[in-house]
């Protein structure tokens, strides 16, 4: 049994499968006799006190603000590595996925806005369909890994990383609350220390853990979303130490399995549980879920492919060697898998509203519908466009 579990965890598609199972379990818990247990568990108050300082939040918020900050440390490190050494380390490498990612952020937001232009109570959800769930999308690609060109995987990874960077900027600019200057001052001091540690190539990760925890707590109290602390910590981990060590590489490899097999599935289980009680076709077709779903199903592929095609047409970028535009379109459809990142932004957009439960439930249903359709269509398009016979013809 243990060998079978270890074999499963080594599969490229394992993290995507686990996310799907976690979401399905959440839906089962939320729509059966277990619903009271599920929702009351997520609202269990958990407090941490240190002298006069205290953080007292429901378990759901600890998952979204705490554990997800660890995931964003990983995101920060991935972005840094790709910018300095990887698929985004030069203009020629970065421009094609960057333009594609830009389209994949702008068009879904416009689709959502167009559908919700007469519903002012829903308009703050415009950023929800901008996101791509890289773990889920790569999980789908991994199901066809033997026939998918390596360059196509690199394109998806680079696009998703830039997409994450865009989501981080959106969160920082549009989803921060009233600021606490005292907390921001402490956060600023922590950032200066982290930057100095990076500058002088301090490689002891315990130092980053201590200062990073102070940064996270102060950012949480400041009104800026706490997960941004994770990104800053990730960026401040040195690529190389004075003696040739690779702290970023080591920490990235240490955190990746925890994020893939614990944090993201826990986030999916905590956020995907939507009660369908009282739901009707009218509600499902209302502007909020419709805007989110169509933003992911139509906005994402149109944005990614259109911007890519125009960039090639104008000579701004070139299609990476070994892949073609048909395959780019298949990947563009897979980018409509918003899932965990879209759920995260939905919680920021509607989590503070008085009617948050019903509104947030509608947003999450839109995400689940859009993600499911994008995953199914994207899988079959990728399977068709990467067939060996078609690859030779291209």
From Swiss-Prot:
Membrane topology: Multi-pass membrane protein
Keyword Secreted: no
Transmembrane feature ranges: 11-31, 59-79, 95-115, 125-145, 155-175, 177-197, 203-220, 254-274, 296-316, 328-348, 365-385
Gene3D superfamilies: Na+/H+ antiporter like domain (1.20.1530.10)
Cellular component terms (Gene Ontology): plasma membrane
Principal location: membrane
Molecular function terms, GO-annotated: sodium:proton antiporter activity
Function of the molecule: Na(+)/H(+) antiporter that extrudes sodium in exchange for external protons.
UniProt name for this protein: Na(+)/H(+) antiporter NhaA
This protein's encoding gene: nhaA
